[in-house]
């Protein structure tokens, strides 16, 4: 791998960069920091790659909601946890779907499948505001459609089993739920930044499967920890889609938690990556 180069996509935006790979990328002097994405990029609107990226986000989030909501309903329908896949199975469904969908869509849209991930990458200037807003809209629409198809196939069961809607469990306060969502999303978005870091990818020869695997595993672990508290949101589109289709008061009572928490967690992860891990503000001064 000595002396070779490859195109490395930064985060999940459309700006490739030519970087050395393997042993030739070990030195900081061999790495060039990619330019920040522009805030507004009207030219994207005329590009098919822009529109197909949004379609990929829509389909991925649609499939994500369809599989995961069905899994949650299957567990709730069982007479006891031993008769179903249980919390571990739900966590595997969420983590496994993220692993598969990020792997499938990373080369097209970056494989966000989550408004919090998109927001964090936008704050780190990995993609434009134009693309970020478009992604979030398509993710939410995909989530609504995914939950809607589940309800269309099983209307009675969907309403009786809660429709996979996120709520704060009895015995926990709104503060506890908010904290769980903030920290859970921080873990996820921090993992996304680390797994898609252009410098690390260049140094490690950018093996494609290395990014989806830790991201999916992070989702799995966060679900194990926070399902008993909030049912695990960490994805505003997932929470919104289930809440809209279920459409009961208890699904909306604490719905703000599943937007505010993930966005705060994503913002903290973006700041931590940019300021502490990459020290970009300090590099620009020197």
Swiss-Prot record:
GO terms for cellular component: plasma membrane
Residues passing through the membrane, by range: 55-75, 82-102, 133-153, 175-195, 209-229, 257-277
Residues with the N-acetylmethionine modification: 1
Cytoplasmic side: 1-54, 103-132, 196-208, 278-286
NCBIfam families: MIP
Organism lineage: Eukaryota, Viridiplantae, Streptophyta, Embryophyta, Tracheophyta
Note on domains (UniProt): Aquaporins contain two tandem repeats each containing three membrane-spanning domains and a pore-forming loop with the signature motif Asn-Pro-Ala (NPA).
Motif residue range(s): NPA 2: 235-237
Region annotated Disordered, chain positions: 1-34
Tissue specificity field: Widely expressed. Expressed in roots and above ground.
A family per Pfam: MIP
UniProt superkingdom: Eukaryota
Function: Water channel required to facilitate the transport of water across cell membrane. Essential for the water permeability of the plasma membrane and for the morphology of the root system. Its function is impaired by Hg(2+). Inhibited by cytosolic acidosis which occurs during anoxia in roots.
Compartments reported by the entry: Cell membrane
Protein name as it appears in the record: Aquaporin PIP1-2
Induction cue: By blue light and abscisic acid (ABA).
Main subcellular localisation: membrane
């Amino acid at each position: 791998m000595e002396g070779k180069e490859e195109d490395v996509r930064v985060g999940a935006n459309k700006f490739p960069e030519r970087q050395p790979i393997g042993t030739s990328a070990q030195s900081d002097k061999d790495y060039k920091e990619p330019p920040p994405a522009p805030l507004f990029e009207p030219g994207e609107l005329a590009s098919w790659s822009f529109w197909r990226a949004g379609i990929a986000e829509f389909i991925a989030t649609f499939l994500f909601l369809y599989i995961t909501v069905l899994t949650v309903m299957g567990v709730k329908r069982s007479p006891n946890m031993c008769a179903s896949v249980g919390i571990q199975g739900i966590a595997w469904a969420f983590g496994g779907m993220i692993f598969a969908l990020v792997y499938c869509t990373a080369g097209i849209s970056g494989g966000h499948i989550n408004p919090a991930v998109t927001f964090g990458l936008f704050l780190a200037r990995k993609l434009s505001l134009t693309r970020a807003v478009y992604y979030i809209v398509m993710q939410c629409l995909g989530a609504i459609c995914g939950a809607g198809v589940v309800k269309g196939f099983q209307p009675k069961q969907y309403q009786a089993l809660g429709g996979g809607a996120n709520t704060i469990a009895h015995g926990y306060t709104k503060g506890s739920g908010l904290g769980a969502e903030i920290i859970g999303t921080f873990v996820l978005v921090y993992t996304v930044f680390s797994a898609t870091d252009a410098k690390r990818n260049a140094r490690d020869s950018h093996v494609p499967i290395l990014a989806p695997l830790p991201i999916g595993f992070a989702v799995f672990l966060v679900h194990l920890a926070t399902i008993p508290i909030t049912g695990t949101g960490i994805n505003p589109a997932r929470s919104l889609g289930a809440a809209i289709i279920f459409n009961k008061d208890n699904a909306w009572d604490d719905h703000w938690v599943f937007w505010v928490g993930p966005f705060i967690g994503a913002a903290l992860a973006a700041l931590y990556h940019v300021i502490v891990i990459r020290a970009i503000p300090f590099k620009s001064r020197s």
